[in-house]
Amino acid sequence: MTPEATRVFLRSMFDAAVGAAMPAQCVAQNLPEKPKGRTIVVGTGKASAAMAQALEMAWNGPLEGLIVTRYGHAVPCKHIEIVEAAHPVPDDAGTKGARRMLDMMAGLTRDDLVIALISGGGSALLSLPAEGISVEDKRAVNRALLKSGAPISEMNCVRKHLSAIKGGRLAAAAYPARVVSLVISDVPGDDLAAVGSGPTVADPTTFAQARAIIAKYKINAPPSVIRHLDAGVDETPKPGDARLANIETKLIASPQKSLEAAAAIARKAGITPIILGDSIEGEAREVGFVMAGIALQVRRFSQPLPAPCVIISGGETTVTVNGSGAGGRNVEFLMALALKLNGAENIAALAADTDGVDGAREVAGAFITPDTLPRARGLGIDPWASLANNDGHGFFEKLGDQIITRPTLTNVNDFRAVFIS
């Protein structure tokens, strides 16, 4: 396979993974029965506006509602209002949207239906601090968590316990109305309580756990946050809470389904796929080093399977940012992978975020090929220094190997494919 054909093949798998999670493909077939009363649509996340549009197209009856999505992710809707807000660090637009959404839950009855459209990114987008915590104090904690290297599960535990709307609080506010949540998962293991910090799902975590996470990562949290966590007042709704008895949650798209769609593309091309898992976590560079070892084992010893094959994985790695670069877990993974492969022939890879945004940059990810390191050094770039500086985006931008998709309007986490030809 030529270098260009290799890139086309890898990109076709990524496109299939994204396509399998598009709201137009998965919302209509999961709609609830119409209620006797009102239908209120609420939602948050990078895919939520596209989910709302798909819902409007399939719903035969009156509805109203409010969606909070990321800047650049809005799509036209006729009956559901779309509000854009900041991600990954919350802004005032998200706070105002969250307050309005919570207010919409007041006065609902058993005859009413709330359809909640939840996808990744909602943890930052739907930001309504608990009483006594300012928006800026919550932002400060969020920024520190993003740089700490904490996995998404731990970040969301803290976020829920600093929030007036997350961790099942939105659903509790809708009681006694029926709440049906349609969820596009972006979290390892499809923990529905973790997607968007679970505004409509019971929360098993506690204030004590949130406080321990702050201590574990040495987060210099503002005094208001420490006081709130130490007080532990008004715990999030737990499994068995009567206010959540009329809740139904449906997983309509997931990382695993997207990985399987990519694997089907490989089989069609006559290349054997192996899915390592949809919930791989850890430091992005360490995952890159490990993945390189697996690829080299295939190349040298045909283990765990012979070439041609493609190693596919998903999940959400982390980057502990120590340098001045922008981070980005997929580009950091690829730099580490390339360095460990050290130009090994017949191995190429793609890693990208299915939402089109890797870290804080409007770039989905990048490619590497056997000539990645020689080309970089020919441009005067020190790859090891780029990795140490967490500057994967700068590295691949100079090489012209970035993958730029614009917002995909869905989000099922990272996609990685290592092709041994």
Feature map (PLM): residue ranges:
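An N-terminal, well-structured beta->alpha segment
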Residues: 1-42, 50-51
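A glycine- and small-aliphatic-rich helix-loop capping segment at beta-alpha/alpha-beta transitions
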Residues: 54-63, 79-81, 102, 106, ...
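Glycine-rich oxoanion-binding loops at beta->alpha junctions
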Residues: 68-110, 158-159
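Gly/Ser/Thr-rich active-site loops/lids in small-molecule metabolic enzymes
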Residues: 133-150, 203-218, 323-349
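Internal helix-turn-beta structural module
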Residues: 334-421
